[in-house]
Amino acid sequence: MSDRIEKSIEIAAPVSRVWKALTDCREFSTWFRVKLDAPFEPGRLAAGNITYPGYEHLRFDATVQRIDPERYFSFTWHPYPIDPKVDYSGEPPTLVEFTLEKAAKGTLLRVVESGFDKIPAARRAEAYRMNEGGWEGQMGNIAKHVGQAP
């Protein structure tokens, strides 16, 4: 198992459009299926309720690390924190990084989630597996959101 998940997709939309879908909290909420309470700001917790069917009882909590307009967006979070009886705050978070580049057909969007080697061994493999599949789905979701199916 790797320490990182890497996914990419070329989206037939300008960088500015993909950037807005990625960093505007209302748009992010739509395609990521979460209802965020406030805009993304570096150093601030982005929190809200998951809206994906079957997971509505779970929270989305991510701390925004860096925003470089139309180029880079990152946050840290606890991967696959689905057990409401567990306090994940004592675990090291993973780092999620999005990069955007102009591409021949529009925008190349990449996501890298790293730091799985620091997740407790008892849940590392499942967190990795679930997030790997999750990022595959989310890349398709953002592409559909901006009007281009993968």
Language-model features: where?
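A conserved amphipathic terminal alpha-helix motif
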Residues: 115-150
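Hydrophobic pocket/interface hotspot
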Residues: 18, 28, 46-48, 64, ...
